[in-house]
Every structure is written in C-alpha cells, then in structure tokens.
Amino acid sequence: MNYFELFKFSPAFDIDTALLAERYRELQRAVHPDKFANDTEQQKLLSVQRTAQVNDGFQTLKDPIRRAEHMLSLRGIELSHETTTVKDTGFLMQQMEWREALEDIRDSADPQASIDALYQSFAEYRAQLTQQLTQLLTSEQAEDALLAADQVRKLKFMAKLHDELTRVEDALLD
C-alpha cells in the first residue's frame, strides 16, 4: 500500500507533519469501526482493516526513517527486515569512535559534558545524512535509490546509538 496516496501526499521525504496529523484524524473519523457498528460483519471487518492501514500509514509517514524506507519500498528496495550492514569505511570508523566515547562516559571527569558532546556529534552527522538522503530520494536514478538505502541504514544505526546514549544518561541520573 502506498501510504503517500492514502494521506494524499506526493512521495517526498520532507512532508508537512501537521498536515499529516490533520489528514490522519480525518481518515480515522471516516473509517472508525464505531461508524459501522450497525453494518454487516464484512463491513465491520473492512473498517477494522482500514483503521489498521491508516494507523500503520500514519506511524510510517510521521517517522523519517520509516518514511524513507517506505519511499524505497515503493521503488522495490526493502529495508525493513534486512540484515545488510553498512560498508562505508569512513562511517564505520566514526561508529567506532562514537562507541569508544560512549564506553568512556562513565569514567569521564564530566559525564554530562561527554554526553552533550556525543548528542551534538550525532545531531551534526544526522543532519548531513538527512540532507544527502533528501537529495537522493528525489532522484529517479536506480543507483541513487541504492545510495539512499545506505543512508537509511546509517540513520537506523545512529538511532540505535542515540537510544544507547539516552540509556547511559538515564543510568547516570539514577
């Protein structure tokens, strides 16, 4: 299913999330199972299925990584259940540096400053990746779609690393 069509958007990485939320509420009102309480069982089931599609579409389009994955899946590139790893040596080196910095936080003289520095580093790198991804996703070239898939893999890794950093920060606050 093309969630961009469902929510009446042109496929694009940058979308108006406020408009997405508005259209989500409209679709929810239109397909909500309560509207079909007095209809046939088939209509009720169809309503439940449509509600699930609307919910999944909203969750997909509101999350930038899932939105990019969806855009790529519409072009025949499935990333959601893959195990392909990033082969970019520069990114792998950066990844190792971040992991080392993450491990060193507990022994740091100023753990919060180390955490803040990592968050800043993540934000800067993520902004670069996102800018490149936006450009690649607008291209119709097959090789650009493959490069976009690599950017998504990197962003997924960074999201996991960000979650780890948040857990370390939470543990230090406890």
Swiss-Prot record:
Q: What does this protein do?
A: Co-chaperone involved in the maturation of iron-sulfur cluster-containing proteins. Seems to help targeting proteins to be folded toward HscA.
Listed name of the protein: Co-chaperone protein HscB homolog
HAMAP family for this protein: HscB (MF_00682)
- One BP term from GO: [2Fe-2S] cluster assembly
Q: Which SMART domains does the annotation name?
A: DnaJ (SM00271)
Keyword Chaperone carried by entry = yes
Q: Which molecular-function annotation in GO is an example for this chain?
A: protein-folding chaperone binding
* Homology family: Belongs to the HscB family.
User: Which species does the entry assign this protein to?
Assistant: Shewanella baltica (strain OS155 / ATCC BAA-1091)
Key word Repeat present in the record?
no
Keywords on record: Chaperone
Instruction: Tell me the superkingdom of the source.
Output: Bacteria
> How does this chain assemble?
Interacts with HscA and stimulates its ATPase activity.
Q: Start and end of every J domain?
A: 2-74
Annotated PROSITE patterns: DNAJ_2 (PS50076)
Any one GO CC term of the record? iron-sulfur cluster transfer complex
Which SUPFAM superfamilies does the protein's record reference?
Answer: Chaperone J-domain (SSF46565), HSC20 (HSCB), C-terminal oligomerisation domain (SSF47144)
**Matching InterPro entries:** DnaJ_domain (IPR001623), HscB (IPR004640), HscB_C_sf (IPR036386), HscB_oligo_C (IPR009073), J_dom_sf (IPR036869)
Q: Which CDD domains match?
A: DnaJ
